[in-house]
Regions:
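Long, non-catalytic protein-protein interaction scaffolds
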Residues: 62-761
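Bacterial signal peptide processing site
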Residues: 26-28
Length: 761
């Protein structure tokens, strides 16, 4: 099992390079090739080569990239926009940090604005002196508010990567939401309607044959998808009962059960199980009826599998592909939906039309007529035999019993499969069954959020995990080293497969150790842990924004003259993060433009966000070289809050409701990362904290402040998956305790954040 998992992830990583090579990627441009499962045969050949190279006596050898192989031709559905081109490197990769050290007096007497700390408790002052910085959790609703307060209070700003990453999240979410409202939702509804009509014609043609049950299943499948978006849609009498039962389970969204539609006419002992709690609308979908309907329909099309091991389900998959191919305009609509969603979130982890189409054409010598299928048993046998050769997905998102062969139980066709993501693939290899049962009988059923930064090379994250006792699982360390090696040797194209992948890549510099020459506070263990919170906070926003698509393991700028008081601020010295974020803004604009989805206003705002991050990168590089920013650059730092507020206003304004306040639309959010089939879901959440940092500007030490992510991890019952609204209520709520006093319901942050957090009252 371990070798299979290793081979599977390598296959997907190598696919990125192969697809990028076929696309002829040009720097700064969107490629014309979508990373798709359509080349799985070639991927398997490549991964087998990699496996042979790694199956050597030297167990410590890193996986090697195979020699170039001639890729298999891709079907038309795979040649769609989707891969980002090679992103430009905007930051100075040769920069050697040389920030001069400075000493802070124990009474802060050489800090020019020490009076700002007069009300601080001694414990907070001590931690600030020890680490050079302090984070106070739960101090705001939005990231820009603190910066605007600082501007009017003549307090030096500390510009964090957290605040800039959060601003990209706001625009990513806004763009995706607008695309779903205006294009994807209507397109999916029309596609479902077309597919239902075609499936009905197939059932009429196959009545009385051994294909009749499969045709009923296909009709029921698309009827459910249609009804989830249009509750008034007609339900054919032939499938009324299973469709009604399925819709009731989806509406209740409170259990795991056998799917009435997918198991139609099948063996109850081998029933396909579905986790219906996944249909609780979450992220930004909750609260808007049209988006909630789109959420449920896409969840249905993304999660349900026509299993390859089930012959009758494979008939249904063939009929679905045949309907997609032959119904007027259906294939083009599907390709458009797949291309746009893949640009945001990545390619399907499971086999889809792009995989099945060439198999069907090869077995049948072209596209067969539905009515002729019962008379072609040899072709069907060739088709099912070829399906057995398709690689399963890297991530299991289905309830599977432990005695089942996971690959056999999950491999098959998904109409609009949920997407492969590196984080989910990492988590899959670090939970039971890939990680063995501990001596005390416990099983690692859910991953830790820290598994991801640890797998990406963070020794700080790995040390925390071991301190928590994760190494009690016999082969957890071995699995972690395997995943680390895979990711360390992953080709560059892995990180440009989608906006999701590029966002994750933008966060990686936060995990790099900061040694001599970096600002003193960045050299501390406490800062390494704070950077983990920055990484995880932005990653939580990424998971939140792609909750539907990513596959889960199981204003006013201010004015007035500048006062003579020295309020010059500082930019967090992470030029690589700011540079990568600028490149990501550029790739977002170019990709949307290539897809015909970029308005003039959005192009302008993405351009502004690109320029802002490029300027912050330049300032951070100057700081690391020991150079003084210009007066114009200090003014940029000073006015930073107004710029953030502009982007916030652009993304949360509503034509009907008007413009919200930060209290109505806070930055805090919550997202699922994994589900334990025994009834628990692990969620990650964010909040907004204030960071205070002692920095030196032009020879004087000052206390600068800014905003950072608060990070939370918690487990809840699957039937109670939290929405953002639930999370906001939890963060701001109070409940009466047994002592009769009211206490905050805000959960505790992980214990490792104690190293850098404190309270001011």
């Amino acid at each position: 099992m371990k070798r299979m998992k290793k081979r599977r992830l390598l296959s997907l990583l190598l696919a990125a390079v192969m697809a990028a090579g076929l696309a002829g990627c040009v720097p700064g441009q969107i490629a014309n090739l979508l990373l798709s499962a359509g080349s799985r045969t070639a991927q398997d050949k490549l991964s087998e080569t990699a496996e042979q190279k790694t199956d050597q006596p030297d167990e410590t050898a890193q996986p090697s990239a195979p020699q170039a192989a001639e890729p298999a031709p891709l079907p038309a559905a795979a040649t769609l926009p989707g891969l980002l081109g090679e992103l430009p490197v905007l930051y100075d990769e040769t920069l050697t940090p040389s920030v001069p050290a400075f000493t802070v007096e124990s009474d802060f007497s050489n800090v020019i604005n020490a009076g700002d700390m007069d009300y601080w408790p001694q414990e907070a002052r001590d931690k600030l002196l020890q680490n050079g910085f302090l984070v106070v959790p739960g101090t705001g609703d939005e990231f820009f508010s603190r910066y605007e307060m600082n501007r009017y209070g003549y307090i030096p700003n500390f510009i964090t990567v957290d605040s800039s990453l959060h601003t990209y999240h706001l625009y990513f979410l806004y763009l995706q939401k607008q695309t779903e409202r205006n294009e994807l939702g209507p397109a999916l509804l029309e596609l479902s309607r077309t597919m239902q009509q075609t499936a009905q014609a197939q059932l009429d043609a196959l009545a009385g044959t051994e294909w009749e049950n499969a045709a009923r299943r296909t009709l029921a499948f698309f009827t459910v998808g249609l009804c989830l978006q249009d509750p008034a849609a007609a339900v054919p009498e032939a499938v009324a009962e299973p469709v009604a039962a399925e819709l009731a389970l989806i509406e209740a969204a409170d259990t795991t059960a056998a799917s009435p539609v997918m198991n139609l006419g099948g063996d109850p002992a081998a029933a396909l199980m579905e986790d219906y709690t996944q249909y609780i609308p979450r992220s930004y979908y909750a609260g808007e009826e049209s988006l909630e309907r789109y959420f449920r329909a896409m969840m249905w099309y993304g999660r349900l599998t026509f299993r390859a091991a089930d012959e009758d389900a494979s008939r249904s998959a063939l009929l679905a592909c045949l309907a997609l191919q032959t119904a007027g305009g259906a294939r083009e609509t599907w390709e458009r939906l797949y291309a746009v969603t893949s640009f945001f979130a990545g390619a399907s982890d499971d086999a889809c039309f792009a995989d099945y189409a060439p198999v069907i054409e090869q077995a049948y010598g072209g596209w067969p007529e539905a009515a002729a299928l019962p008379q072609q048993p040899d072709a069907f046998a060739a088709y099912t035999a070829a399906l057995a050769e398709l690689a399963p997905g890297a991530v299991n998102s289905m309830p599977v019993f432990e005695w089942e062969d996971r690959d056999a139980a999950t491999a098959g066709f998904r109409f609009m499969g949920q997407r492969f993501t590196l984080d989910a693939a990492v988590f899959q290899q670090l939970i039971y069954r890939d990680v063995e049962q501990a001596a005390d009988g416990s099983r690692r059923m859910l991953p830790e959020a820290l598994d991801l930064p640890a797998a990406l090379g963070s020794d700080t994250a790995l040390a925390i995990l071991n301190e928590q006792g994760e190494d009690k699982y016999p082969n957890y360390g071995e699995q972690m080293e395997t995943v680390r090696a895979q990711l360390d040797s992953a080709p560059a194209a892995t990180w440009t497969a989608s906006l999701y992948a590029a966002w994750l890549d933008t966060l990686r510099p936060l995990l790099q150790p900061k040694g001599e020459g970096w600002p003193q506070y960045m050299q501390t263990e406490a800062w390494a842990k704070r950077s983990l919170a920055s990484f995880l906070g932005s990653w939580a926003e990424l998971k939140h924004d792609t909750a539907l698509y990513a596959k889960q393991v199981y204003g006013e700028m201010g004015g007035g003259p500048i006062d003579a008081e020295d309020d010059r601020g500082y930019v967090e010295a992470e030029p690589a993060v700011f540079g990568k974020l600028a490149a990501l803004c550029q790739a977002t604009a170019e990709g949307l433009d290539a897809l015909g989805l970029l308005s003039e206003a959005d192009a302008e705002n993405l351009g502004r966000l690109y320029t802002l991050n490029e300027q912050l990168m330049t300032i951070a590089e100057k700081e690391l070289r020991g150079e003084l920013p210009t007066d114009e650059e200090f003014e940029l730092i000073r006015s930073y809050g107004g710029q953030l507020e502009h982007f916030w206003t652009q993304t949360v304004q509503d034509e009907e409701a008007g413009i919200y306040t930060p209290q109505q639309m806070p930055a805090a959010l919550v997202a699922d990362i994994a589900t334990d089939p025994n009834g628990t879901v692990r969620q990650v959440g964010t909040g907004v904290g204030t960071i205070y940092v002692l920095v030196e500007v032009d020879g004087s030490i000052r206390l600068a402040s800014g905003t950072v992510f608060d990070f939370y991890q918690l487990d809840v019952p699957s039937s109670e998956r939290m929405t953002d609204q639930d999370w906001w209520a939890l963060l701001s709520g109070y409940e009466q305790g047994e002592d009769g006093q009211y206490h905050s319901t805000r959960p505790d942050q992980p214990a490792w954040t104690d190293a850098y957090t404190g309270a001011l009252y």
